[in-house]
A protein has these predicted regions:
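A cross-kingdom feature strongest in bacterial/archaeal respiratory oxidoreductases
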Residues: 1-55, 84-275
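Non-catalytic, well-ordered alpha-helical segments in soluble enzyme domains
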Residues: 59-86
Length: 275
C-alpha cells in the first residue's frame, strides 16, 4: 500500500487490512443485508436482513450501486427492482399471472422462489479428472527440490481468520487434529523423523525471505515431504478473543502460490510448546 496514494478498505471488521489503508468504509454484516442467491440445484431465494444495520454499514450491492452512480442505492430497492425487471417473479405455472407485488410477497413469505428452474449438472469425465489430478501430483513432485518441503495452507475452522475473534469458533475442535484455540505445523511421521522433530517441537518454516515459527503435530495421513498449516491464527489486529491463539502463517503466502508452495525449508529451532 506504500506505493498507492489512496487506499480504501471495505468490510464489516476493523482488521489488519483496514489498518494498512488510509480509509475504511463500514460494511454491513450479511445478516443486515438484502440480496438473493441460487442453490446448487437451481433454487432461487431472496436474502432478507435479520436486523437493521447497526452502524449504517453498506452491503456490497449498495456500494457498487453508489460507485456506479445508480439512482437506486438502497439494498431493498435494488433487489426488488432486479426481480421486477427480470422474469423471475413474473412467471407462474397458472394461466393467469398475478401482479408482481403478489409474487414478491409470496417469495418473501416462503423464502424461496417457485417454480425453481432445474439445473442439469454436466457429466463428469472420470478419466479426464484422474489425468488432471495425476498431472498436478507429478508436477508438484517435479517442483520439489532435494531438501525442500511442500507447504500447504488450509482455511480451517476459522475460515482463514474471518472467525478468529469468535470464541465459539475457536472452541470448535478441528475435525482432523482435534486442536482448539491453536494451530500447528502438520507433518508426517516419516518427514518428522527425517528432520529430527516430533509433536510439540518448535520449528521454523521458510519460504523465500519470510520465516515463521510454529509447533509440530505429527499427523497420520499427512503426505510425506509436506506440511499443512491452518490459517487465521496469530493475528496482529484480532480483538481480545483471538489474542495469543496460534501463529500467523500468512507471511509465507505469495500471490502466485496462495495455497501450496513446494520450495519450503523446515528446521528445528529448539524448544517445545504444548498444543
Amino acid at each position: 500500500t506504500a506505493r498507492v496514494p489512496n487506499t480504501v478498505h471495505f468490510g464489516d471488521q476493523d482488521d489488519e487490512s483496514s489498518a494498512a489503508c488510509k480509509w475504511h468504509l463500514v460494511g454491513a454484516h450479511p445478516l443486515e443485508c438484502w440480496g438473493d442467491g441460487r442453490a446448487w440445484n437451481g433454487t432461487l431465494s431472496i436474502q432478507q436482513p435479520m436486523i437493521r444495520a447497526l452502524w449504517n454499514g453498506m452491503s456490497v450491492i449498495e456500494l457498487l450501486a453508489l460507485v456506479a452512480g445508480e439512482e437506486t442505492t438502497g439494498g431493498f430497492e435494488i433487489v426488488r427492482r432486479t426481480w421486477e425487471e427480470s422474469t423471475g417473479l413474473a412467471m407462474t405455472p397458472s394461466d393467469q399471472e398475478p401482479p408482481f407485488d403478489a409474487n414478491w410477497r409470496k417469495a418473501l413469505h416462503d423464502g424461496v422462489i417457485e417454480p425453481a428452474p432445474v439445473l442439469e449438472s454436466p457429466p463428469l469425465d472420470v478419466a479426464a479428472t484422474i489425468a488432471m489430478l495425476t498431472s498436478a501430483s507429478t508436477q508438484s513432485e517435479a517442483d520439489l527440490k532435494a531438501g525442500d518441503i511442500e507447504v500447504n495452507f488450509v482455511p480451517g475452522t476459522l475460515l482463514g481468520g474471518r472467525m478468529s475473534n469468535n470464541g465459539w469458533m475457536q472452541e470448535l475442535p478441528d475435525p482432523i487434529t482435534k486442536l482448539a484455540w491453536d494451530n500447528a505445523v502438520l507433518i508426517s511421521e516419516k518427514t518428522a523423523n527425517e528432520h529430527g522433530v516430533t509433536t510439540g517441537d518448535i520449528v521454523s518454516i521458510t519460504l523465500g525471505k519470510n520465516t515463521v515459527k510454529g509447533t509440530v503435530l505429527v499427523q497420520p495421513g499427512q503426505a510425506v515431504g509436506t506440511v499443512s498449516i491452518m490459517l487465521g491464527y496469530g493475528r496482529d489486529w484480532p480483538g481480545r478473543v483471538a489474542s495469543g491463539a496460534g501463529f500467523n502463517a500468512y507471511p509465507l503466502r505469495t500471490s502466485d502460490r496462495l495455497w501450496s508452495n513446494p520450495a519450503g525449508k523446515l528446521a528445528a529451532v529448539g524448544g517445545t510448546e504444548q498444543l
